């Protein structure tokens, strides 16, 4: 019950998205399409995937996408379907993080909208376009080894956050946008379940990525706060989040849809402030 189909990784140019693209390549995907706002990074990660893949028949491509633009998302999705034939797995990792903390009493509306545009509307656009593409393709057996698992047209995994379920001080726009991702994922799962499409999200806490490093530099006291609330005593490495994504995409989670899979080192077991 391994990864065998085609993967579309949005936001795959770095951080968690890059780790997911590389994981699909090493876990046996047939083709990996790496999409990113930075086309050069997408092509570079695709080349890394090509080098790591165990199969000589594996292919990887880089695609440019701007998830805040409806036409760009539609065009990129259509391009991937045309090149790959179908999308079996979609991982939506594109997003922005807080670079400077702000209290509710002083947060500018433009900054709040900026987070919603990328983290929420962008997630919606990708989920919508990929849902439509998956509905148009033929169903396949989830697993030839376990035929009672039925058929599938695909699996979508969105990147949410531990801040989809709790809150932390000074980062209202991020928290609100990620709460919306969890709701979007649950409703998309309901809408898609009769079409044989599963939709889940991964909810990590802090991960060692450039986004978190920028947040630590811009939000006073965040580094100490993170250390105080993560029982495991460290932030995650991107590969640990990619492992959870691969599980939710693979046949091993064939009875899981609409879930917010928390991967947080125990963070939500403690008070967040």
From Swiss-Prot:
Which BP terms does GO give this entry?
secondary metabolite biosynthetic process
Class in the EC hierarchy, top level: oxidoreductase
Loss of this gene results in the following: Impairs the production of flavoglaucin and congeners.
Where along this sequence does the record place binding of NADP(+)? 16, 66, 128, 174, 178, 207, 209
Q: Which InterPro entries would you find in this protein's record?
A: NAD(P)-bd_dom_sf, Sc_DH/Rdtase_CS, SDR_fam
In this protein, the active site sits at 174, 178
Q: Where does the chain cross the membrane?
A: none
Q: What is its EC number?
A: 1.1.1.-
Record keyword Oxidoreductase present: yes
Question: What PROSITE patterns has UniProt attached to this entry?
Answer: ADH_SHORT (PS00061)
Q: Which CDD domains match?
A: SDR_c
The keyword DNA-binding appears for this protein: no
Q: Which GO terms describe its molecular function?
A: oxidoreductase activity
Q: Which UniProt keywords apply?
A: NADP, Oxidoreductase
Q: Which domain of life is it from?
A: Eukaryota
General function of this protein: The PKS fogA releases the carboxylic acid (8E,10E,12E)-3,5,7-trihydroxytetradeca-8,10,12-trienoic acid as its product, as well as derivatives with one and two double bonds.
- Give the family, as the similarity comment puts it: Belongs to the short-chain dehydrogenases/reductases (SDR) family.
Mind telling me what this protein is named? Answer: Short-chain dehydrogenase fogB
The organism's lineage is:
Eukaryota, Fungi, Dikarya, Ascomycota, Pezizomycotina
Instruction: State the gene name recorded for this protein.
Output: fogB
């Amino acid at each position: 019950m391994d990864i065998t189909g085609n993967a579309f990784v949005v936001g795959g140019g770095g951080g968690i998205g890059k780790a997911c693209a590389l994981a699909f390549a090493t876990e046996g995907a047939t083709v990996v399409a790496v999409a990113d706002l930075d086309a050069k990074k997408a092509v570079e990660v695709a080349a890394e995937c090509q080098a790591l893949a165990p199969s000589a028949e594996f292919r990887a491509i880089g695609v440019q996408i701007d998830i805040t633009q409806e036409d760009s998302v539609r065009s990129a999705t259509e391009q991937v379907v045309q090149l790959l034939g179908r999308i079996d797995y979609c991982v939506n990792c594109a997003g922005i993080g807080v670079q400077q903390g702000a209290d509710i009493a002083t947060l500018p509306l433009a900054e709040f909208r900026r987070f919603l545009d990328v983290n929420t509307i962008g997630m919606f656009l990708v989920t919508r376009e990929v849902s439509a593409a998956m509905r148009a393709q033929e169903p396949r057996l989830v697993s030839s080894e376990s035929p009672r698992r039925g058929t599938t047209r695909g699996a979508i995994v969105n990147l949410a956050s531990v801040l989809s379920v709790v809150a932390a001080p000074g980062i209202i726009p991020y928290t609100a946008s990620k709460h919306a991702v969890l709701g979007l994922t649950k409703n998309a799962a309901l809408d898609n379940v009769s079409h044989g499409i599963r939709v889940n999200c991964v909810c990590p806490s802090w991960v060692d990525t450039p986004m978190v490093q920028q947040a630590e530099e811009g939000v006073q006291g965040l580094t100490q706060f993170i250390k105080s609330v993560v029982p495991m005593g460290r932030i995650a490495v991107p590969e640990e989040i990619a492992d959870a994504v691969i599980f939710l995409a693979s046949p091993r989670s064939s009875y899981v849809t609409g879930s917010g899979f928390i991967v947080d080192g125990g963070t939500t077991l403690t008070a967040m402030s």
